[in-house]
Amino acid sequence: MKILLLRLILCLTFQGIFLQSSFALVDSNVREFLENRVNQWPEIYLTSFKFSDISKDLIYPKWFEGSWLVTSQDIINDSEEPVIYKVNFFKNYSDVIVGNRAKNSESIGKAIFGDTLIKVVNDPDSINNQITYLKDDFYIDSRITERNQIQDDDIFFADELVIQTVHKPGASRVNQVETISKFQKCDSEQLEINVSQKNDICGFQYVATYGSKVGDPSIHAIKTNKYKLTFKFIEN
């Protein structure tokens, strides 16, 4: 019996080591994939997201928890005024930090569309679907079809592909948008002044628009944008 128990323990131990090695390998592959996407930008093509997993929401490092004021500056068109909005990240039932998708999208939408925005609604059956309602019977149906991210306590690095269908009376238009996000704590001395204050978060978003040819894996981006983002902590 003792020999059998020992063999079982050894078997479970080896399985655990194998799983950890497998997760580390996948994470390494995803990191390489994401770095390649950033390096290819802006001469970027729609690709196969072979490590994609849309069964889980984006998970953020613990230091993202709380509410933040975001300033997003278009680097390509730096003459444009920055877009400023609030976002919130919270600990979900699985004890991981996720974004408040509807609230955050609505906040960004208000900053972009102003009073034209009516509301943003999440699909109760899927974390990947969302509808943005605008005035004059105008609405945008957004579906996340691909998602890659690495798990790293020091950085948030992810890539999502969204199919957006814009509906307005008498017409509809499909567009594919890829957003690569890379954020980390800013280099800052602010904690020396106030130890209770969280570090600002800094980073970039690389956005590529591919048009309406859904399913074609070799489309060149028809439009690219790069944004510099700064998050300033508001409250928990």
Regions picked out by a protein language model, each given a short descriptive name:
Residues 21-67, 71-113, 209-236:
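Amphipathic/hydrophobic helical signal segments and adjacent flexible N-terminal regions
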Residues 114-121, 127:
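Active-site acidic/histidine clusters and adjacent loop/turn architecture
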Residues 124-218:
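Short helix-loop boundary/capping segments
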Residues 8, 66, 181:
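Residue-level detector of short, conserved catalytic/binding motifs and their immediate flanks
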Residues 1-24:
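Classical Sec-dependent N-terminal signal peptides that target proteins to the secretory pathway
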